[in-house]
Regions:
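Gly/Gly-Pro-rich "capping" loops immediately C-terminal to redox-active cysteine motifs
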Residues: 28, 32-36, 42-78, 87
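N-terminal export/targeting leaders of redox proteins
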Residues: 1-25, 106
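Functionally constrained cores in energy, signaling, and assembly domains
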Residues: 5, 16, 49-50, 96-97, ...
């Protein structure tokens, strides 16, 4: 009985590893589209994956922001960066945060 419990647990854990966010996924691609086109983040920010070299805002490759930091900055604005709350949907903000946090971490 114990062996079957451990086998089932191992099976579940093994397959959960493959469900972690890995690019390209739909949210990642949506976030990249928001970054490049709708919010035009690359105008101000450098990000290697997006091939952008903006120099007004911080270089995202260097600061490697986590998803919460990106959501907060995009939603409320920070420094000279305007808030995008009301401009982007919650889903778009979460998608761009997902994209930036994964791309900058590489």
């Amino acid at each position: 009985m114990k062996k079957s419990k451990y086998f089932c647990l191992s099976f579940v854990l093994f397959f959960n590893l493959f469900s972690l966010p890995v690019k390209p996924d739909a949210i990642f691609e949506m976030g990249k589209d928001v970054f490049l086109n709708k919010a035009m983040c690359g105008s101000c920010h450098a990000l290697s994956d997006a091939e952008t070299v903006g120099q007004i805002g911080p270089n995202l490759n260097e600061i490697k922001p986590d998803i919460r930091r990106v959501i907060n900055a995009v939603t409320k604005g920070i420094g000279v960066m305007p808030p995008f709350e009301g401009v982007l949907s919650t889903q778009e903000i979460e998608a761009v945060a997902h994209y930036v946090s994964i791309s900058a971490a590489e």
